[in-house]
Amino acid sequence: MPNTPHTMNLYIKNIAQLVTCQGTEAKHGREAMGQIHTIEGPAAVVIRDGIITFAGRMADVAPSMTEGCRELDATGRCVLPGFVDSHTHLVFGGYREDEFQWRLAGDSYMSIMERGGGIASTMRATRAESEDELKASAHRHLSNMMKMGVTTVEAKSGYGMNLETELKQLRVVRDLQDEQPLDLYSTFMGAHDTAPEYKGRPTEFIEYLCREVLPEVVRQNLAECCDIFTEKGVFDHEQTRRMLTAAKEAGLSVKMHADEIVPFGGAELAAELGCLSADHLLRISDAGIKALAESNTVATLLPCTAFSLRADYAPARKMIDAGCAVALGSDLNPGSCFSASVPLMFALATLYMGMTVEEAITALTINGAAAIGRADTIGSIEPGKKGDLVVLQYPSYKFLSYHFGMNLVEHTVKGGRVVYTNS
């Protein structure tokens, strides 16, 4: 369907079940995350100029409200907010299929990095590829994500670790925003690892990023957020504090890769620094859980990465019961998780991480939006929010966990436009 103005006006009628996930901030804990605010049908949603103007019972829709709208009949269908993938490494060069086989043979993620694989391997490929090559690859991934109901994607740099390539990655994200339907949230992550030019000198590398790369990222308006890999043997607390403080002073939001490999106090530091989110958290401590539960920092969990690494999953049930706000992200990247599968995220979260399907929906909608600071505009179906929705092939949201491993999306709606239909 062409992206003409009238296509941003949409009337979705005869909805069997409408899941609104209403709210404008992260939902913390079992009770809040379990409340997804369903309306049993017949229900309806009206979108005008890309913004939701009505969401409720179809009987309450006046004819004047839908004048000039395209109609979409959702008889026998469940409608939910568009999914928000709040953690991806979308733009990268090359693949690492051989490393996956090494992992299957028993090599650890850290041992592969020590052999010159891991992030360093992708860094070399990303430095070598052109912007057009990187853009074409990222565009394919976005198209696949759109088919699974994703309407907003966080996209990190971090495979350059020098000025030229970090800017190149972020320009690709900027350009893709205008060349495909999904909304992108750009994150500068030069501190993904220490660049080979600074091997053994991580503090000097952080200073290079703060003094030479970050100012140029900000000057060119290429990022909204800054991320860092806080981990034993990568970047310590003081290096993290230096990087993220500089980013905040430059006007960026901040987030962290935290407590992925070993308990390292990353969650506590993320809460202290006011991060939008602390991500991974496979090895979070009880003190870290308490710190996140008492803060506004979202705990973004990445089940597909744990699955790919054959690692223990993050303690989602324990975190939610303690009062944390949990989001789910794919962690799409060419190494530890070459997948952006929403069906796999739902299956792992509910079958192996102890989350209810309602909590998983919250984690992929309003809490995912909060993890990128956009819960005021996306993540729920209510007047004033963007018209981002998913129409399932089934009448109930419960099929998202029940019919596992399958893409159940019939339509993806972005800003009032039907951008994908499963034909």
From Swiss-Prot:
Subcellular location(s) of the protein: Cytoplasm
Pfam families associated with the record: Amidohydro_1
EC supergroup of this enzyme: hydrolase
Pathway(s) it belongs to: Amino-acid degradation; L-histidine degradation into L-glutamate; N-formimidoyl-L-glutamate from L-histidine: step 3/3
InterPro entries in UniProt: Amidohydro-rel, HutI, Metal-dep_hydrolase_composite, Metal_Hydrolase
Family statement: Belongs to the metallo-dependent hydrolases superfamily. HutI family.
Protein name: Imidazolonepropionase
Protein's organism: Porphyromonas gingivalis (strain ATCC 33277 / DSM 20709 / CIP 103683 / JCM 12257 / NCTC 11834 / 2561)
Gene behind this protein: hutI
